[in-house]
């Protein structure tokens, strides 16, 4: 089960609760999250925010290809993956990407 979405920052924000809602199931024994945020510097230069731009269909296709590669190599049953990435301006400490993975076993 895979959920992917590009979020328009001018319309909405990425919310971890969306990942929790998608991944919450009594079928899963483990859930892990990665949350990317904007930091205040890059290569020793001050940063006040980042503007992300991409062709949505290409990004979604890349996420799907990564999912399919992992699925074929690891053969993990009863899994769910949630990926949302922001598009547009993201300020300091704001979320830019959320990746969540849930599976049946913790090994």
Give the role of each language-model region.
Residues 99, 104-107:
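Well-ordered alpha/beta subsegment
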């Amino acid at each position: 089960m895979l959920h992917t979405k590009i979020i328009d920052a001018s319309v909405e924000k990425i919310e971890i609760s969306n990942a929790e809602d998608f991944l919450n199931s009594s079928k899963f024994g483990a859930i892990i999250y990665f949350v990317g945020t904007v930091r205040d510097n890059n290569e020793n230069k001050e940063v006040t925010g980042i503007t992300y731009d991409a062709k949505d269909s290409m990004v979604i296709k890349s996420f799907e290809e990564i999912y399919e590669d992992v699925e074929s190599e690891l053969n993990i049953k009863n899994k769910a993956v949630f990926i949302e990435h922001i598009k547009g301006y993201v300020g300091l400490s704001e979320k830019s990407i959320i990746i969540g993975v849930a599976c049946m076993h913790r090994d």
